[in-house]
Amino acid sequence: LSTEFAILICGAVLVIYTMSGGMWSVTMTDVIHFFVLVGGFSLAVPFVLHNVGGWESVVTKLPPEQLGFTKVGWKTIIGLVIMYFMTFSTGQESVQRYFAAKNERTAVLGSIICGIIMALFAFVPAVLGLVALAEFPGIEANNAVATVALNLMPPVMAGFVMAAVVSATLSSGAGDLLGAATVFTKDIVEHHFGKSLTDAQLTRYSRLCVLFLGIIAIIISLVSKAIIPMLV
C-alpha cells in the first residue's frame, strides 16, 4: 500500500464521518480511537521489550545521557511545557469537548482526567522510541514506532500499533476539520446571512465546508509529507 493511497483512504474516511455526523460522530469515533490508541501502544511495550531481551538490554545499548529526563536542556523543556499548555488546552480538539460537556463540572473533570492519562501515557511511546534507538541506531525519529512495530512484533500486533498511530491522527484531524467548518459557518455565514438562513441551510454550509477543507488537506498531504515546515 503506497503512502499516497493510504493518505487518500484515511482522508476520505475522515471527511465522510466528520461531514455526515458532525460533533456526534467525531465524539463517538474518538471513544474508539482512545481504546485503540492506548491499547495498541500499551500492548506493544511488553511484546517489544521481550523480543529485545528486556529493558536491561535496551539500557546497555544506549549512552547514559540518552536516558536522562533533561537531555534536551531545561530551556527547551520549559518552552515546550508553556507552548503545549497554551495550545493543547485552547485547541479546537479540546475546546469542542469542553462545550459539548453536559455541564461545567463534567468539562473540568474530563479535562483533568485527560491530563492525567496523557501524562502517564507519554512514557509508552517514549519507551518504544528508546527501543528503536537501541536496536536501530541512526533511525529517523518519524520512523521509530513503525520500524519497531514491523521488525519486533507479530504481524497482528504490528497492525494494531499502526492502527493506533492512525487513530491519533484521525482524532485530531476530525476535531480540527469540524472546528474550522464551525468557525466559517458561525462567524462568517451566520453572522452575515443568519437571519435569512434556516438551521438546515447552515448545516449544509457546514458540511460543504468540511468537504472543501478536507479535500484541501488531502491535497497538501499528497504534495508535502511534513506540515510543520509549511507553517514556519
Model-predicted regions and their roles:
Residues 1-232:
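Membrane-embedded helix-loop-helix hairpins and adjacent transmembrane boundary segments
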